[in-house]
Amino acid sequence: MDNMLQFMKLVGQLKRVPRTGWVYRNIKQPESVSDHMYRMSMMALTIQDISVNKERCMKLALVHDLAECIVGDIAPADNVSKAEKHRREKDAMVHITGLLDDGLRKEIYNLWEEYETQSSPEAKLVKELDNLEMIIQAHEYEELEGKPGRLQEFFVSTEGKFHHPEVLGLLKSLNEERARHIAAGGEKTTDTDSLTLAKP
């Protein structure tokens, strides 16, 4: 049980790891990695598509960023190559799952690897949820700051990455709400005429 306690303490670290993208954009009280994964898991829970395994989607959402309790949230702006990022996270996952009994160790590590390699329909869907959760959060920060459009780069970065019908439906609702806020102008700190909404 000592190892299980250490595992749970590592999981708890995710509550204290801020999402780097928000830190770099000077967001006050940025969300943690744990915050992000919780809403992703709730998104997975609400998926109604019977062609995918909902339980597996939830598990993938819960473990996909687990390595960040050790390596931190490595953002594109950190200029770390994909190969190096994967190496660091793989080493972290070997350590983290090594605290668990063999069955759990294999299950959690294999879930992480499945997400990393995008080797299943569930992993591909959860990747879409990952991107969608990010831009929902970006929209919420724009609302909280009263600066519609300030975090446009996050929306641009997801263009062409959404395909699942349920994800597209939620994206449509998000785009419509955000368009209204941009039209209203907020504090007009951004040239909203040049903005585009997130694209499928």
Curated annotation (Swiss-Prot):
KW Transcription regulation (keyword) present: no
Pfam families, sorted: HD_3
Name by which UniProt lists this protein: 5'-deoxynucleotidase HDDC2
Reaction equation(s) it catalyzes: a 2'-deoxyribonucleoside 5'-phosphate + H2O = a 2'-deoxyribonucleoside + phosphate
SUPFAM superfamilies xref list: HD-domain/PDEase-like
Residue numbers binding a divalent metal cation 2: E68, D73, I74
Species whose genome carries this gene: Danio rerio (Zebrafish)
Protein role: Catalyzes the dephosphorylation of the nucleoside 5'-monophosphates deoxyadenosine monophosphate (dAMP), deoxycytidine monophosphate (dCMP), deoxyguanosine monophosphate (dGMP) and deoxythymidine monophosphate (dTMP).
EC class (word): hydrolase
Gene that specifies this protein: hddc2
